[in-house]
Each structure stands twice: as structure tokens, then as C-alpha cells.
Amino acid sequence: MSTPTSNESTSSSSNNSDQRVLFPDIQRDDIQVGDHIGVGTFGAVFSGNWTLPDGSQRTIALKKVFVLEKEAEILSKIRHKNIIQFYGICKATGNDFFIVTEYAEKGSLYDFIHSEESQSFASSSGGNSFDVVVKWASQIASGIQYLHYDAVDTIIHRDLKSKNVVLDKNLVCKICDFGTSKDLTHSCTAPSWGGTAAWMSPEMILQSEGLTTATDVWSYGVVLWEILSKEVPYKDYSEFRIFTMITQSGITLAIPPSCPAPLKQLMSNCWKMTPKDRANMRQIQGELNRLAGNQKVMDECEKFMGLEDWKTEIEKQEKNVEKMRKDLEKRREQLEIREKALKQRMKVEQAVLDSARHPPEDVHQWSEHHTSHWVETVLGRVANDKKFLDRVNAAVFRNRITGARLLGMTQNDLEHLGVHKVGSRIELMKMIRKLADTQKALHNFPTLEQAKRIEMTLKTEKEAAGQLANDVDIVIIVGMYVRKMNATRRKFKFYADSDWIDDTDIPAKSKSKHASSLIKTVCFSVLDENTKKPINEPACSISSGMTTNPDWITVDTEDDVKIRVIVSVYYADIVTQPRNTEVIKVVTSLEESKILEERHVHLRLRRSSSSASISTPSPVIAPVYHPFGHLNNGFHHTTSSPQLRGFWHRKQTGMNRHGLTETELSSLQEQLRTPSPDKKVVDENVIIHVPKLTRRRRTTTTNSEDTEKSDTNNKTPESQARRVHVHGGKDKWNWKKGKSRPKFT
């Protein structure tokens, strides 16, 4: 058996060097381990009995650790009446150690102030409750002041909280658990994670600045708040929520307005967001001494302690925080909607830019984007000045130079656009004329594939128009979906559908059984009725049955819900009257999904002539010359002459000028060359006479026997003129009478 001070052994070393630290060594046989009483930062805590050399027994606390790090080293350097006393170390089983300290009979301050014993303590001791508050606050401040200013090395506790302050049998506060503490050899130390969320300072949460003694000052303010309110700080919030409230929103613990000014100011000075603005422990200790010496303030604080304002103020703060959370959630959702709209807008703009690089073949269909890209391409060959090209592009958009305007531009117009160099204007005018000439030359000569496509489109439209009656009746149905997220939050969206008034109203010749075939586009606009501002981006969708606005809208029913929805229905080209229908409704309740309105609409349809055929003048396509030197695919609806259309149609279908295909014409010619009988019976009562084809012998002279007879019988000037002549005016073959004909070998 040995005393705590007589026997010393080497048990640990510092983290930064090989310097060996000596701790009082207590024999394991002298220690009897008792019940488990708590958990420290890096080990479990047990009660126990220590047999002293004189045979007496002492109740102790044993903290079991795996490695002797900073805690034992720090405890061996400090000794103060308000800091737990360190006795030494004891070797446990294996490589474990026991840190032996004094035992606090009343447990932690946290357990005491939240127990029934705390409620009866003031009355049983004969004093007032605020006297106890000031006494405990002074004792804790005295211990922290010793660590900061009077110890061998400046020590930052870093985990000061009511659970790390214990009470002995005389209800004296003692600071314990130095597992996360650090020596402060300079003005600050590097930040590292340690502590408990509700008691942590902003700089420890963010780990953005070096830690100073001001970190413990923040935690001390929270402990003082616990003693006064007897409430758990940030009780209903998660650690992440606490970190966000402190660092991002700057929300500190609630202090009732009825709190006396000196006490309120003391806690506020501990919770400054900037560490250097906080009070130090010496200033806090002095303020507590002045507070205890002012009886008037003490009476005022005692009266305040009897009120229930803490709970009321905490509940009020919770409501404000919840409202702030909902506002942040709304803002987040709005930002997501805006981000989605921005991405959609960027996607559309990119599509416009891509479309500008591939303009339609019809120059009259060009937009400012197509014109701008075309002009930039042409001018880019003669000028490499980007600023110049940007100015010209801006002028094109400012003056709305579309394809139709581009074809009619002059050199003066180009100069007005900012093309001041003569060479650039000449080159641009040359390309504009070439563009116009190409457009004009190809105006009536579309490709066969394009002409066929246009004719088929027109044929389909005419057939569809002829299949419906002149007038039809449909019903437009506007409604809304509602989803209940929780007691107060709702999500909703609107929809539009259509149907025939009655099943008997469906046109008999209609191929489509759906009334939505008469609707082209449906647009939704949702506005706040109170502010008249849009809640989300207006959305349009092509009708293919039932349509809805794409995004869900989230609102809180606690607010005054008053939403205006505008549904605009645009009809297909086949509908002549009305061209569109608008449904406006105001929604004041979001309890359930429902139909807002059923609007009956009478539609008048366009009809086409039944005698219309494909040969009706149809639009054709004129390719456009592009500065890149190739033709683009596109459509331009113009009209060509019937002769040209007939020629292109025959060429497309493979027919010749006789109205026959090449195959039919070849077959007929073959039949004519083949000998056949004079008569061929096709039917019993029908006889077709086919003349017998005989091959006549070709004559080599025009004064043959047959010719002479013919000329004798018909000696007219016309017959003489019909005689065959060769070049030079003489007969093809002319032999003298009596001479033999020439022989051909």
C-alpha cells in the first residue's frame, strides 16, 4: 500500500514531444470499483472506494480510459476549489487506466436543476432561489477564470455545460471532464471538433477561426441560462438545426422581456457572434459581485424568478423559428421553381440558337435569330472584328430584321444597321441578291418528295374537315388536384379536360372519338389574388387529352389562401368560331380535389369542298441558298402554275404525256407489234375488229409502180409536194427508165 504522492510512475507522454509526465500512482489492490454512474467524453465513470494508507476509506470517482491523454495531464497541473480534485491514476485490466478523482455526491448540475430536489432546495435552506443562482454562477465563473488566467498554462475547457459541472454534498459547483480541453500556450489554438451542440460557440461550429478563451464564455452564458430558466437549451431541435440557427440565423436562447436588465445584459455579453466582442471571465465575475451587492436588483431578480415567463418566451421563439423555417422552405421552393424556369429558358434559348444555325428554306419564315446568324456568317468572311459583328447583330434585333425584310434591304439600310465599310456592304448585298434569286428561281420547282408531302398534308386536312359536321358542342372541364402534406401544408395543381356534351353529339364521320382533337393548346396562369402577382411561371401544353400545369404549387393554409387561375383554351385550325375560350376561377379552399367549372362551348367548324382533289393548286417549297453552300430542308407554302404542277405530278408518278405509265406504254407497243387474227371475240355479243397488220416491202424509189399509179390518179400540187426529197431538193432515189436498180451488198 502506498500514498498518492510517495509512489510515482511514468504513465503518459505529451502529444507534441517525448517529454514524460509523472502522475501519482495508486495501487489496484487499494481500489474497489462500484456502480456505473455516468459517461464522460472519452470513458465511462464509476463510483468506488479507495483504502488510504492509514486504513480509512474514501469515496472516489473512477473514469476508465483506454489511453492517458490530455485529461490526466491537465488535471495534474490544476488545483482549485471549484474544479474536481485529481488524486492519481490506477492501472486497470489490460491496457486500460482509471483516472481517480473526488466523488460528487449530488451528481451533475444538469440532473439537479431538473429534479424535484431543486424545487424544494431554496425553501428548505431558508434563502431565496436567486441567491443560489448567483452563488452557483459565481462558483462556475471562478473555476473558469482560474483555467483562463491563474493556472500554470492557459486552459480552454471547450465542453463547458451543466452536465460537466457536478455538486458535492455541500452543493458546491465543481467543473469536471477535461477530455476535450486544450492547453493554450499562445493567444489561440487550432480549431477542432469537440463539445455539445447547444453549448457550442459559432467559431467552434464553423471551425473557421482559432479558438480562444471566448469559446468558454459562450458556453458559460448557456449554463447561466439553464440555471435561471431550469429548461433544456434548444430542447426540440436537432444538432444540425441548432448549428444552422446559431451560425446562419444568429438565433440565441430566448430571454423574456421581463428579465432584469443587468441579468439580461450579462447573458447577452456572453453571446456576441464575434469572439473578441464577448466579455471575459474576469469581467463576468466582477459583474456577478456587483449584482450580489445590490439588494434592489437582487429583489427584482428574485421576483422575476417566480414568474413563468421563460416557458412563454421559449414557446414564442419556437413559433417564430417555425415560421422562419416555413418561410425558408417557401423561398427554397421558389428558388427551385426559378432555377427550373431558368434552365428551361436557357434550354429554349439554346434551341433558338441551334435553330438559327439551321434556318427554314423559306426566307419569309426566318426570324431575327435566323437573320442574325446568316448576316454574321456572311460578314464573318470579310471582317473578323467581334465587336463589329455584335453591333450588327444588336441592330438586327433592335430593328426586327426578319427574312422578309432582309430580302428587301438596300445598301442604305445596311449602312443604317452599322455596316459602314463599303466592301462589307457590297459583299452582303451580293449575298442578299443571290439569296433572293435562289428563292425566286426555285419558287415553282420544289423537289418531288417535298411536293408529295405537302399534297398529302393538304389531302389529310381536307378529309378531316369533311368528316365533321359544321357545328359541334363540347364541354371544357377545369378542376384541381389537392394533396395534404401535413396539417397546414397543401400541394395543388390545375387540369383541363374536354368531352362531347352527349355521346349522341359525336360526329358520325369523325375518325377521332375525343373532343380534345379540336383543341390545339391549353395555357395555365396561377396568380395570388391579393397581390395580383404570378405564383409560378405560366405554362402551356399541347392538348393530347387531359392537360395539367406541370409543377405542383405548395402553400400553407394558415395564410389567407386566395388564388386566381386563368385557363386559356386555344382551338385547332379546323375551328373557325370561337378561336379560344378563357376560364377564370378564384380558389379560396384547398381541402379537397374538385371540379371548378364545366363550360359548354358551341364550335363552328371549317368545311372543305367534296370535289377538291390533289390537283388543286397546292403549296410548294422553295429551297434557300445558305451561305455555307448547301440547301436546308424546310417548307414554304406558295402556288405554282397548273402546267408545271401537272408535269411534276406526271414525273413523280412515272406517267408520260399520254396518261400512261412507262410499263403500260411498253406493253401496248408490244401488243401492236405481235400479229393477231382479224377478229377477237371478247364477249358473246361484242366483237372487236382488229385490222390485220402486214409488213410492206420498203421501196427504194419514189417512181415505183405504186407511186406512179398514185401520182397518175392524183396529180395535184399537194401530192407533188408530198414527194420525198433528200437534202438538196432531189429525189431520194432516182433512176432512169430502162436501167437496172442498184444492188446493195
UniProtKB/Swiss-Prot annotation:
Widely expressed; expressed in most tissues, including intestines, muscle and the nervous system. The active site is at residue 159. Residues 31-305 form the Protein kinase domain. Pfam families: PK_Tyr_Ser-Thr (PF07714), SAM_2 (PF07647). It catalyses: L-seryl-[protein] + ATP = O-phospho-L-seryl-[protein] + ADP + H(+); L-threonyl-[protein] + ATP = O-phospho-L-threonyl-[protein] + ADP + H(+). ATP binds at residues 37-45, 63. The keyword Kinase applies. Residues 735-745 have a biased composition (Basic residues). The keyword Nucleus applies. Residues 366-438 form the SAM domain. It is an enzyme of class 2 (transferase). Residues 307-352 form a coiled coil. GO terms for biological process: signal transduction; stress-activated MAPK cascade. It is found in: Cytoplasm; Nucleus. Its cofactor is Mg(2+). Keywords: ATP-binding, Coiled coil, Cytoplasm, Kinase, Magnesium, Metal-binding, Nucleotide-binding, Nucleus, RNA-binding, rRNA-binding, Serine/threonine-protein kinase, Transferase. InterPro entries: Kinase-like_dom_sf, Prot_kinase_dom, Protein_kinase_ATP_BS, SAM, SAM/pointed_sf, Ser-Thr/Tyr_kinase_cat_dom, Ser/Thr_kinase_AS, Ser/Thr_Kinases-Pseudokinases. PANTHER family: MITOGEN-ACTIVATED PROTEIN KINASE KINASE KINASE 20, SERINE/THREONINE-PROTEIN KINASE TNNI3K-RELATED. Belongs to the protein kinase superfamily. STE Ser/Thr protein kinase family. MAP kinase kinase kinase subfamily. Stress-activated component of a protein kinase signal transduction cascade that promotes programmed cell death in response to ribotoxic stress. Acts as the proximal sensor of ribotoxic stress: directly binds to the ribosome, thereby acting as a sentinel for colliding ribosomes. Upon ribosome collisions, activates the stress-activated protein kinase signal transduction cascade, leading to programmed cell death. Acts by catalyzing phosphorylation of MAP kinase kinases, leading to activation of the JNK and MAP kinase p38 pathways. This is Mitogen-activated protein kinase kinase kinase zak-1. It comes from Caenorhabditis elegans. The lineage of its organism: Eukaryota, Metazoa, Ecdysozoa, Nematoda, Chromadorea.
